[in-house]
Structures are given as structure tokens and as C-alpha cells.
Swiss-Prot record:
Role this protein plays: Component of an amino-acid transport system.
InterPro entries attached to this UniProt entry: Leu-bd (IPR028081), Leu_Ile_Val-bd (IPR000709), Peripla_BP_I (IPR028082)
Signal peptide: 1-23
Keywords: Amino-acid transport, Signal, Transport
Protein family per UniProt: Belongs to the leucine-binding protein family.
Gene Ontology biological process: amino acid transport
Protein name: Leu/Ile/Val-binding protein homolog 1
Length: 371
């Protein structure tokens, strides 16, 4: 299997391992290798590589082995388009990625024009699969589902609370915040404050002062863990006692590293944790034996490869358009997420979102625990 890594359009050395150095089916892994969301990129890469090794060890797809090329999109839409164009030029047939919705959506258009099928383990913005393209799939849920769950939970558990909805102005963060706000408004609850902040913001003192002045006691965050961790820590430092709730953008143990003890009690939505499925115990152990905790998007990426390989077998072809048709018509596929089928848009027919709370374990470390 061949593996290459490039950032944007810069191509690095080829590393060959196992079998022939040049395989027949080229799969691109489009992820943030560097930048603020690199932790999620590592999850997606580890999951995809492990699943591809399993597929190759079993003979590949329709008798052809899979090769990997990795593109670093740095969580930037422009870099994502560069990665997509490079993948197309290199003859990539299938893409596992991207992670950020703001990167995945424009990249998907490049892939569609070049006959490339894309499966995202992490892009939750509804627009991704609402474009009417033939090639867009995801193994995660959508923000309209996630926002509905969050909004209902806040309404049910924090009646008469003063709620602030804060987002990071990205397609993912603002999209999720807006879906949560929409559900709250439908239920008759009006947010006290609705604010956007910039990705990379470090000092939230002015925002926190505004939250305190407004008497806010619930903060909903649409965004990623780097900013969330700082906001949580600074809220505690500045004496703002408010329940912090967010979405799947904070499901990284790095959140606890940034927020410190202030992370205790933070809540977030995410899909049911596949690590809890006893059927995955051997696989989970294999990851951990190598020093990697397969949290968050690791197994969503693994499932993307599994469904892709099984759909190709069902189609009897490695042609992306034939595989896309099989993915929509030939499921369910056996995956680490359970039996996985896709609808006509490419969205998964999976159990919805559930609520998690960050708690300190017996080992003294914080983790997100399903409620």
C-alpha cells in the first residue's frame, strides 16, 4: 500500500508498506494534519488506515488493493480546494474526509466534477448533502438533527434560564448554533444573547462581561474545542457560573487539557459511542495497544471505509459512480457503527444524537460520559 502526504499542493515522499508499492485503487484522506483541528485529523487518518489495512489483508476491493494519499487541508476552505484538485490530478477515486463542513462543502464540488466519491466522517452541516450531488456521503449525523436534540434538552432541563447562543462564525459552528436556536425558538424560548466570535480568539473577557451583565446561566457554544476550552476556563476564572453546552466539535480530550477542572459538568451532543459496543472490543484494544485512543471520529472513519468496500463488492465495480449507487441501494453494511445504510442524499440511517457530560474518572482524568 502506498501512502503520500502533502500540504495543499506540496507533495512529500512516498512511503510504501505491505504488498506492491503501487496499488490499483487510490483513496485520498483529506484532513487537517496541522492547524487547530489536527487532533480530529489524526482520528480520521488512524481510523481509515486501520480499516484499509483490514480490507487489503482480505484481498482488497474486487481484487484490487487500496493505496492511500493524505492531503492536509489545515481546516481552511481554500486549502481544501487545493487538496481536492491535487487528489483529482493524482487519480484519486474515493475520499475519506474532509472534517470541517466549511472545507468539505466546496471540496465536494471539485470531487463531483472529477468523478470522485467522498465520505465525510465529520462534516455535519446539512448543506453538504443537500447540494444534489451524486457523490456526497457522511457517516456522522447532521446539525439539524443535533441542534434539535440540544435545543430540546435545554428547554426540558433549563426552564426559565437565560440562554446565550455563541458561535465561531464558521459553516459548522454557526450552522449548529442556528439549528439549536431554531429549536429553542420553536419551543417558545427566546435566547438572551446571540453572538459570534472569531476562530483563534484567545481573550473572551469582553464577551464574558456581557454574559454576566445579561444574567446568562446557560451558554450554548457552536464551534470547536480550542476556543471552547478557553471560554470555559475564562468563564470559571471570571466567576460566571453558567451551564456550558456544545456539540460534536468539542469531543476531544484536548478540551480538558485547555479548560482544566472547569470542564467538569460541561455537556455536549454526539452520536452513541461505538467504543461501548462489545462487538468492537478487539478493535478498540488493538488501537489502545498501539497507544492511540480511538475516540470521537476514529471509528466513524473506519466505518466509512467499511461501507465503501462493501458497496464496491455489492456493485461488482470500483467505479465511483457505481459504488455511490450501491451505497444508496445495497445497504445495510456491517460496520463498527452497526448496520449502516445511506439515504438518497448520502446521509446515514443511524441512531441520532445523545447527550454527554464531562466527568472526572477514577484515574483522575476527565472524559465525556454518555448520559
Amino acid at each position: 500500500m502506498r501512502k503520500t502526504l502533502f500540504s495543499g499542493v506540496a507533495l512529500a515522499a512516498v512511503i510504501a508498506f505491505g504488498g506492491s508499492a503501487w496499488a490499483d485503487v487510490l483513496v485520498g484522506i483529506g484532513i487537517p494534519v496541522t492547524g487547530p483541528n489536527a487532533v480530529y485529523g489524526a482520528q480520521i487518518q488512524k481510523g481509515a488506515e486501520a480499516a484499509i489495512k483490514e480490507v487489503n489483508d482480505a484481498g482488497g476491493i474486487n481484487g484490487e488493493k487500496i493505496a492511500i494519499t493524505i492531503g492536509d487541508d489545515v481546516s481552511d476552505p481554500k486549502q481544501g480546494i487545493s487538496v481536492a484538485n491535487k487528489f483529482a490530478a493524482d487519480g484519486v477515486k474515493f475520499v475519506i474526509g474532509h472534517f470541517n463542513s466549511g472545507v468539505t462543502i466546496p471540496a465536494s464540488q471539485v470531487y463531483a466534477e472529477n468523478g470522485i466519491l467522498e465520505i465525510s466522517p465529520g462534516a455535519t452541516n446539512p448543506q453538504y448533502t443537500e447540494q444534489g450531488l451524486w457523490n456526497t456521503f457522511r457517516t456522522c449525523g447532521r446539525d439539524d438533527q443535533q441542534g434539535t436534540v440540544a435545543g430540546q434538552y435545554i428547554f426540558d432541563h433549563f426552564k426559565d434560564a437565560k440562554i446565550a447562543v455563541i458561535h465561531d462564525k464558521t459553516p459548522y459552528g454557526q450552522g449548529l448554533a442556528d439549528e439549536t436556536k431554531k429549536k429553542l425558538n420553536e419551543l417558545g424560548t427566546k435566547e438572551t444573547l446571540y453572538e459570534g466570535v472569531n476562530v483563534g480568539e484567545k481573550d473572551f473577557s469582553a464577551l464574558i462581561a456581557k454574559l454576566k451583565q445579561a444574567g446568562v446561566n446557560v451558554v450554548y457554544w457552536g464551534g470547536m474545542h480550542p476556543e471552547a476550552g478557553l471560554l470555559i476556563r475564562q468563564m470559571a476564572d471570571q466567576g460566571l457560573k453558567a451551564q456550558f453546552i456544545s456539540g460534536d466539535g468539542i469531543v476531544s480530550n484536548e478540551l480538558a487539557s485547555i479548560a482544566g477542572d472547569a470542564v467538569a459538568g460541561v455537556m455536549n451532543t454526539f452520536g452513541p459511542d461505538p467504543r461501548d459496543d462489545k462487538a468492537n472490543a478487539e478493535l478498540i484494544k488493538a488501537f489502545r495497544d498501539k497507544g492511540f485512543e480511538p475516540e470521537a471520529y476514529t471509528l466513524y472513519s473506519y466505518a466509512a471505509v467499511q461501507s465503501l468496500a462493501q458497496a464496491a463488492k455489492a456493485a461488482g465495480s470500483n467505479d465511483p459512480q457505481e459504488v455511490a449507487k450501491a451505497m444508496k441501494e445495497k445497504g445495510p453494511f456491517k460496520t463498527v457503527l452497526g448496520d449502516l445504510s445511506y439515504d438518497e442524499k448520502g446521509d446515514p440511517k443511524l441512531p441520532g444524537y445523545v447527550m454527554y457530560k464531562w466527568e472526572k474518572g477514577a484515574d483522575g482524568k476527565y472524559n465525556y460520559i454518555q448520559q
